[in-house]
Amino acid sequence: MGLRSLGIASSTQMYLAPNWDLVGHPFDCTLNRRLLPPVPNFWGQTTGWLSWQATLLQQFPWVGPRSNSLGSNCVFLAIFR
């Protein structure tokens, strides 16, 4: 399924949304390391990943979780600019 069929312009940039670890640090699921400086979530916060993920999946059901070898969940998030 292409981006255009989802109503997303081809110029839309896709970002890998970071997972937040147990102490609130953003965690890069691709590189298996924390991100410094902290990367804000959908609402500009750097904590509260679980509630954000739940809201994101409700609003965008086609966005699915991804898991790396360490078991961290990631989602692909379209950020409109």
Swiss-Prot record:
It comes from the Eukaryota. Completely overlaps FMP40. This is Putative uncharacterized protein YPL222C-A. The lineage of its organism: Eukaryota, Fungi, Dikarya, Ascomycota, Saccharomycotina.
